[in-house]
From Swiss-Prot:
It catalyses: DNA(n) + a 2'-deoxyribonucleoside 5'-triphosphate = DNA(n+1) + diphosphate. The keyword DNA-binding applies. This is DNA polymerase. In addition to polymerase activity, this DNA polymerase exhibits 3' to 5' exonuclease activity. Gene3D superfamilies: DNA polymerase family B, C-terminal domain (1.10.132.60), DNA Polymerase, chain B, domain 1 (3.30.342.10), Helix hairpin bin (1.10.287.690), Palm domain of DNA polymerase (3.90.1600.10), Ribonuclease H-like superfamily/Ribonuclease H (3.30.420.10). Keywords: Disulfide bond, DNA replication, DNA-binding, DNA-directed DNA polymerase, Exonuclease, Hydrolase, Multifunctional enzyme, Nuclease, Nucleotidyltransferase, Transferase. GO terms for molecular function: DNA binding; DNA-directed DNA polymerase activity; exonuclease activity; nucleotide binding. Belongs to the DNA polymerase type-B family. The gene is pol.
Length: 773
């Protein structure tokens, strides 16, 4: 199983290193015979001798083309002859490529920016993560001492925790009497002990949570300061920290550094990405948070160190559990795309598609288009019309079906052969013409991207079929990861067409796909309404909610399935409308804002939920009660009564103060805040009293009654004394409770002023409610 590749230099020449696991053992293979190259298109082949004479300087040595050969390729499906130019060393290419490109006889150069080790994987047909080797994993985490205003890594590391299949342990240099804690004499000894643990356990995978941007850099800097050689690589190297866009990325040679943070950011949508929030979202269990100031206080006073050690141990354990959860999917993506898991786990979906296409282009002898320069990038920023959205029908509706197109955009790309190499192609016998935009796509041959996409969807169906047939739970899970990886990649192709930095960028393709998408959903809506008596309540891009007013649940379900048979017989190619769900009740507010409840009483909301921590418990609780009243009981008037009751209790100071606490996180050093929100004002007052505040600290506060700015009236919750303080009822009504429910009740004709307890007027409710069945 290939874990990764890189290259080193011996006697001025590159040597590819292949890090792999074979028969349970780690090994490194070497290849000294792979040469770097680029392609050049010449106006006249006779100019090749002039091109071979071009020289450049690199670190005091002269760089030139060492040999050239003429090769037949395809470019966007059309035959082309280019020159393959070979060089001595990969770094020769950036040194000389501009000079070659600027030569008058050169039309253009190609594939000059593909990293050498990645090029090797493509050309040799090698697939990382292929095979059934069992990989050893080890997660680690650090706790540090930080004081405001300090430079990064100025404070010591207090604890290093690690976890693997054998359990979790903590290394520290203060005496803590717990069975999973190993105590050493100094910070230096702690780092050395950790390095020894890694060497002895010899994991194939090191798992971190934001290790790219914190743990490794901190450890490396402290090691330098303390005179420790921070050796973690299997061939005796230190971790390599490199910039990747606006972030950093850390490589450990011979081991896969699997940083969960970018993977989880790409995979799931959460209001906050703390380790605690992620763990609760994935596993449904809360995890205790110990804040930086608490850690500092415990370390400096010696009180509460056991709690900090337990927290540190749990951090490593949770990171390990999350790693086990997410690693198999990334391994499948790595196999699918053909690049290392280290790269894939840090890639956007657009980059995943690009690496997949580069490999397939090589296999099909296609020359890859170049990435855009700055001028071309600016030109590509033009927008185009997106998917169809039908504005929602207001009111409370019952017996609702949700129908959507299976893989709408991939299906359109394949069905209509939407590809840069088929776009407006001359001399074709048959074309598909995109509605509204008029772009033509040749149907005489399968386009490069539609054919690849077709293969992917076909493979996914085979995997799903195999998954259904197998009774082995482990095999079933692996097959599920495979089909999900294929789905992620397949669903990214449409977005890739419109991705400005893409090699196979094609605005005409992207806007044609959305044009066909709009046509299909609009036609489908018209058919279900005119021929089957449905009313479509809300539609967005590839699906819609619909009901038959006055009909019972069984009638709606039966007619929906009849419609599916009817419409799918008419849809071309791979296009297929599917029955996705039935909801006994629902309402739709505006685009991407709705709430529905299924037959098991499970409520699904989109765009309405308040999950950020800067909403108080009273706001969240009131919104949940309002949703239940409307969706479970079908009673909008009851929902309004709930809001009036809560606002009345707030006005009369009958709400427990713990339900009014607002939590907000400090995200930068206090001195860097230009605007002073309530949480910043409270944090500054705490800091002035000597309490340690750092980025990541969560401030819990309550707003008091009085005049002046909110920030001046916000105090830490633990200072709130009901005998001395009164909360600002008006603030909580106007800024917490009403905003949480107003967006829901607006769908039934209510305005904010209609919801306060002292208001009695109601707005024509009957006009908004639909007949129940």
């Amino acid at each position: 199983m290939i874990l990764d590749t890189d290259y080193i230099t011996e006697d001025g020449k590159p040597v590819i290193r292949i890090f792999k696991k074979e028969n349970g053992e780690f090994k490194i293979d070497y290849d000294r015979n792979f040469e770097p190259y680029i392609y050049a298109l010449l106006k006249d082949d006779s100019a090749i001798e002039d091109v071979k004479k071009i020289t450049a300087e690199r670190h005091g040595t002269t760089v030139r083309v060492v040999r050239a050969e003429k090769v037949k390729k395809k470019f966007l499906g059309r035959p082309i002859e280019v020159w393959k130019l070979y060089f001595t060393h990969p770094q020769d290419v950036p040194a000389i490529r501009d000079k070659i490109k600027e030569h008058p006889a050169v039309v253009d150069i190609y594939e000059y920016d593909i990293p050498f080790a990645k090029r090797y994987l493509i050309d040799k047909g090698l697939i990382p993560m292929e095979g059934d080797e069992e990989l050893k994993m080890l997660a680690f985490d650090i706790e540090t001492l930080y004081h405001e205003g300090e430079e990064f890594a100025e404070g010591p590391i207090l604890m290093i925790s690690y976890a693997d299949e054998e359990g979790a342990r903590v290394i520290t240099w203060k005496n803590i009497d717990l069975p999973y804690v190993d105590v050493v004499s100094t910070e230096k000894e702690m780092i050395k002990r950790f390095l020894k643990v890694v060497k002895e356990k010899d994991p194939d995978v090191l798992i971190t949570y934001n290790g790219d941007n914190f743990d490794f850099a901190y450890l490396k800097k402290r090691s330098e300061k303390l005179g420790v050689k921070f050796i973690l690589g299997r061939e005796g190297s230190e971790p390599k920290i490199q910039r990747m866009g606006d972030r950093f990325a850390v490589e450990v040679k011979g081991r896969i550094h699997f940083d969960l943070y970018p993977v989880i950011r790409r995979t799931i949508n959460l209001p906050t990405y703390t380790l605690e929030a992620v763990y609760e979202a994935i596993f449904g269990q809360p995890k205790e948070k110990v804040y930086a100031e608490e850690i500092a206080q415990a370390w400096e006073t010696g009180e509460g160190l056991e709690r900090v050690a337990r927290y540190s141990m749990e951090d490593a354990k949770v990171t390990y559990e999350l790693g086990k959860e997410f690693f198999p999917m990334e391994a499948q993506l790595s196999r699918l795309v053909g690049q290392s898991l280290w790269d894939v786990s840090r890639s956007s979906t657009g980059n995943l598609v690009e690496w997949f296409l580069l490999r397939k282009a090589y296999e099909r002898n296609e020359l890859a288009p170049n990435k855009p320069d700055e001028r071309e990038l600016a030109r590509r920023r033009e927008s185009y019309a997106g998917g169809y959205v039908k504005e929602p029908e207001r009111g409370l509706w019952e017996n609702i079906v949700y129908l959507d197109f299976r893989s709408l955009y991939p299906s359109i790309i394949i069905t209509h052969n939407v590809s840069p190499d088929t776009l407006n192609r001359e001399g074709c016998e048959e074309y598909d013409v995109a509605p509204q935009v008029g772009h033509k796509f040749c149907k005489d041959f399968p386009g490069f991207i539609p054919s690849l996409l077709g293969d992917l969807l076909e493979e996914r169906q085979k995997v799903k079929k195999k998954m259904k047939a197998t009774i082995d739970p482990i095999e079933k899970k692996l097959l599920d990861y495979r089909q999900r990886a294929i789905k992620i990649l397949a669903n990214s192709f449409y977005g890739y067409y419109g991705y400005a930095k893409a090699r196979w960028y094609c605005k005409e393709c992207a806007e044609s796909v959305t044009a066909w998408g709009r046509q299909y959903i609009e036609t489908t809506i018209r058919e279900i309404e005119e021929k089957f008596g449905f009313k479509v309540l809300y539609a967005d891009t590839d699906g819609f909610f619909a009901t038959i007013p006055g009909a019972d649940a069984e009638t709606v379900k039966k007619k929906a399935k009849e419609f599916l048979d009817y419409i799918n017989a008419k849809l071309p190619g791979l296009l297929e409308l599917e029955y996705e769900g039935f909801y006994k009740r629902g309402f739709f507010v505006t685009k991407k804002k709705y709430a529905v409840i299924d037959e098991e009483d499970k409520i699904t909301t989109r765009g309405l939920e308040i999950v950020r921590r800067d909403w108080s418990e009273i706001a969240k609780e009131t919104q949940a009660r309002v949703l239940e009243a409307i969706l479970k009981h079908g009673d909008v008037e009851e929902a309004v009564r709930i809001v009036k009751e809560v606002t009345e209790k707030l006005s009369k100071y009958e709400v427990p103060p713990e339900k009014l606490v607002i939590y907000e996180q400090i995200t930068r050093d206090l001195k860097d805040y230009k605007a002073t929100g309530p949480h910043v004002a409270v944090a500054k007052r705490l800091a002035a009293r000597g309490i340690k505040i750092r980025p990541g600290t969560v401030i819990s506060y309550i707003v008091l009654k009085g005049s002046g700015r909110i920030g001046d009236r916000a105090i830490p919750f633990d200072e709130f004394d009901p005998a001395k303080h009164k909360y600002d009822a008006e603030y909580y009504i106007e800024n917490q409770v009403l905003p949480a429910v107003e967006r829901i009740l607006r769908a039934f004709g209510y305005r904010k002023e209609d919801l306060r307890y002292q208001k009695t007027r109601q707005v024509g409710l009957g006009a908004w409610l639909k007949p129940k069945t």
